[in-house]
Amino acid sequence: MPSRKTGEIWLAQLDPTVGSEIQKTRPCVVVSPDDMNAHLRTVIVAPMTAGSRPARFRIPLTFQGKQGLILLDQIRTLDGVRLVKRLGALRGPTLAATLQTLQAMFAP
């Protein structure tokens, strides 16, 4: 299984889903810590989308020439087999905003 690092963007198979969970195979940002990723077969990801409304817990970004959002309200744990391929990684301010928003969500 390939290693995954915090901030990497992977194409992930999210189906099957239920109710309001975001679905399909789509880019997702790895948000679990590197030490956790190194020891577990699971990974925590935040899906990305180009078709959603902005909110304080949704981080805007441009990836592969497309405007989109990182949906921190839709984070989930996936088995590593759901990760299809590595597409890239977040950098600088976008990665910092993502991690800061997660911290604010869980440790207000």
Language-model segments: residues:
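Conserved functional hotspots at enzyme active or ligand-binding sites that engage polyanionic ligands
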Residues: 1-108
